């Protein structure tokens, strides 16, 4: 790998920064050119080359010198064109979706800033630089989720996202501080010292990934984030914010892979997340929230692979997942515009006739998510299921991951049955599928079909002989078929059956295991106690001791003493004079 590669990466970063200063109409073409440029260094990836480039110093101190340093390896050079490609497609779609927004220029600039901060994470070679990008995607998600700040729900969702991510950020800060004081924040040096890494910074890494990638226990913010514009949801869930947590663990996996406790935590956390989110998605009818919970489920699958010591498979699934997930969100945005901002899939139907191309793209995206053979999702998901089935690590994790696979096929089919099939159930505002809609969706559709095959052809040079039983080999396909059949029954029950009493299991998953209740209760009570402590102990004590109350208490005794005087000065003087004279006469008589 020669100096052309870092030159190209630096050119891309500088061009993106310059694009922020230009009118938003040129952004689409700029991103297309940058994407084509970013494809040039892909050829050296086949040789597993790696290059580290150190630039100008960022912080100089007596104890630590921190330089701006980028690392160019397989992960960074492969994910950079993917992020550019998806942002290019989403930006072009946004020109139609946000056309009536008076601040569309600022919106496009926010999307570009979001992309830049993600590229900082991808190419960072030290923990401090990674933390800058980490905080960047956090603050940009806050601004974009709360874009429609006139809506109370959008403001609440933006605050919820940033607060949940603060919890994960504490873990990353703890890890960075620990590494800075004990070894080094340079990633190459961390990889060398992986044998002696303490468990505390590893806990911080897992906590950071849990918060950023919305794993179980810190998951409620992700469905709420759907209050933002649909292009924001597409970018957030495909190639930026939520994959940053898993990418962090993939990047720093060499310091994790020898710690069995942390790997077990990742395995259990990922398996629980993928099953829980898939089950919750089957209870929702908001199309964007279903897709959001689908993202959580797929992130749990990636976390499971990290727990099985297979970060390469997690990265492969991250790549394939980003294309069809972006396409799912953009298709849902087209539907929502067509139906006067209606997001309930029960109110949709017959969209194959009014939006034929969007419906076709949605079908392909859902089939890829289900793991339909020879689509891009199949090559990663099927490999993950086979790896799980052949692993002796944890049979419980295998079981609930298989349940999640069935449920993912279930809710994906449910989306298609409710939206595309049957007859319209609400008023349509038919719009022409312009090139700003079809072109990005067509590009994402091609990558959702071909990306898996291209990855296989470029990485697997020889055909591997299958040595596993046919039941294990076909396990993923069988699970998908079961999920499709199950969704047919669920759709029929939704349309034609009314429950006699509330379903507690349905309510449990629909309310996301009621995690909002303890989270908000603990927060509110903590704030109340803090406020009471501040006002009742600090403020009141200060006022009573040092303020007007304290001054009043100090001079009260003196005032009382003065008020006891009766102003009988003549009597007092006469008594004083007589006493004095008596004493003097007594002294003189002696």
Curated annotation (Swiss-Prot):
Its EC number is 7.1.1.2. InterPro entries: NADH_DH_su5_C, ND/Mrp_TM, NU5C-like, Proton_antipo_N. The keyword Nucleus does not apply. GO terms for cellular component: mitochondrial inner membrane. It catalyses: a ubiquinone + NADH + 5 H(+)(in) = a ubiquinol + NAD(+) + 4 H(+)(out). Coiled coil: none annotated. It comes from the Eukaryota. The chain crosses the membrane at residues 1-21, 31-51, 77-97, 104-124, 130-150, 167-187, 190-210, 230-250, 261-281, 314-336, 355-375, 398-418, 439-461, 466-486, 568-588. One of its GO terms (biological process) is ATP synthesis coupled electron transport. Core subunit of the mitochondrial membrane respiratory chain NADH dehydrogenase (Complex I) that is believed to belong to the minimal assembly required for catalysis. Complex I functions in the transfer of electrons from NADH to the respiratory chain. The immediate electron acceptor for the enzyme is believed to be ubiquinone. This is NADH-ubiquinone oxidoreductase chain 5. It comes from Lycodon semicarinatus (Ryukyu odd-tooth snake).
